[in-house]
């Protein structure tokens, strides 16, 4: 790791501290590669930490795991990359099945080791994914959340009783994951409804997805109406809404984890043979597919991204916390 650099440290709930001469005491691994971070996104899980609701992310940590960087030295010096932040063992039954997201012996960038809210970061070589040097750095930084979306949509496809293009689909939430989900479904020709309580995000859904977003706090959502429901929020209320709105024989894919516990209508799930499918992150195949989809325009032009300098990280978190940030994704620039 670089001796001194600019970095943002999560120092306490609702407190992100910009440090001009941060010194890392992290012990790097032999196979770690040093990256100069060009762009890094703020994830919903970073917001959970910011709110003090993620016991896995403690004060003193550099958050951030959605990134684009440039290799600093070695034979690939200057090459642009992103990376899978899940550092897995590579030898357990799940890793050998290609389901490395389920590896129980895993570390994670921005959780168990320092993340990308900094000018530099190290990452194991096995996690690197090379990208075209001409590709937009902000778009590359969206690969990680897009990979979660690819995984979620693939699960919906695998568990639906008819082709996804024929499935009337409900997307709950129009944050980054929800918006990207709607955009990918749009590329498949899916007829959908998008729910979002933050009215500031409604114009973005209209402009980029081409559907009018609905505020479920102001408008009732039909019961037993959707073939597929993808919950990108994961609160107790949206969990209940997912089950009530899905058709008999339909599929619910749960992506969001706003609430750590939930009560669901197990009677409906059983009597109407509803498939409830959990979705945790992605595997490396999903990750690489997401990069390809971003590059070929399957997620649209991504012009809705909001860019801010790393020094304004605390302000970015506050605006997301207060609901005043209209954009579904803020990208921080460490070398602004």
Which residues does each PLM region occupy?
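N-terminal glycine-rich cofactor-binding segment
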Residues: 9-27, 44-72, 100-114
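Glycine-rich beta-strand-centered segment in the early N-terminal region that forms part
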Residues: 25-40, 53-93, 132-135
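N-terminal Rossmann-like NAD(P) cofactor-binding module of classical short-chain dehydrogenase/reductase
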Residues: 82, 230, 253
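NAD(P)H dinucleotide-binding glycine-rich loop of Rossmann-like/cofactor-binding domains
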Residues: 89-172
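Mid-domain Rossmann-like dinucleotide-binding core that forms the NAD(H)/NADP(H) cofactor-binding site
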Residues: 135-216
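A short acidic, Gly/Pro-enriched loop at the edge of an enzyme's catalytic core
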Residues: 221-229
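Glycine-rich phosphate-binding loop and adjacent beta-alpha segment
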Residues: 236-296, 334-336
């Amino acid at each position: 790791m670089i001796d001194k650099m600019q970095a943002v440290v999560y120092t306490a709930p609702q407190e992100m501290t910009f440090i001009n001469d941060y010194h890392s005491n992290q012990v790097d691994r032999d196979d770690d590669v040093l990256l100069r971070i060009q762009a890094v996104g703020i994830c919903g899980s970073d917001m959970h930490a910011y709110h003090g609701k993620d016991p896995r992310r403690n004060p003193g940590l550099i958050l951030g795991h959605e990134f684009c960087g440039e290799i600093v030295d070695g034979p690939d010096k200057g090459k642009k990359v992103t990376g899978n932040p899940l550092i897995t063992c590579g030898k357990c039954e799940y890793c050998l099945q290609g389901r490395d997201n389920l590896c129980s012996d895993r570390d994670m960038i921005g959780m168990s080791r320092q993340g990308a809210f900094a000018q530099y970061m190290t990452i194991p070589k096995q996690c690197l994914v090379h990208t075209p040097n001409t590709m937009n750095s902000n778009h590359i930084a969206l690969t990680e959340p897009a990979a979660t979306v690819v995984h979620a949509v693939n699960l919906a496809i695998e568990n639906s009783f008819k082709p996804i293009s024929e499935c009337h689909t409900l997307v709950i939430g129009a944050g980054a994951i929800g918006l990207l989900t709607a955009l990918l479904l749009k590329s498949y020709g899916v007829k959908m409804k998008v729910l979002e309580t933050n009215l500031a995000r409604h114009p973005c859904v209209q402009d980029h997805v081409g559907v009018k977003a609905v505020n479920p706090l102001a408008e009732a959502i039909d019961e037993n109406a959707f073939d597929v429901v993808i919950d990108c929020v994961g609160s107790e209320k949206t969990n209940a809404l997912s089950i009530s709105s899905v058709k008999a024989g339909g599929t619910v894919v749960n992506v969001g984890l706003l609430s750590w516990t939930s009560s669901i209508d197990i009677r409906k799930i059983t009597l109407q043979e509803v498939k409830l499918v959990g979705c945790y992150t992605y595997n490396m195949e999903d990750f690489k597919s997401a990069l390809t989809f971003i590059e070929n325009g399957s997620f649209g032009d991504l012009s809705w991204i909001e860019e801010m300098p790393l020094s304004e990280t605390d302000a970015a978190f506050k605006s997301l916390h207060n609901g005043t940030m209209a954009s579904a994704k803020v990208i921080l620039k460490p070398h602004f």
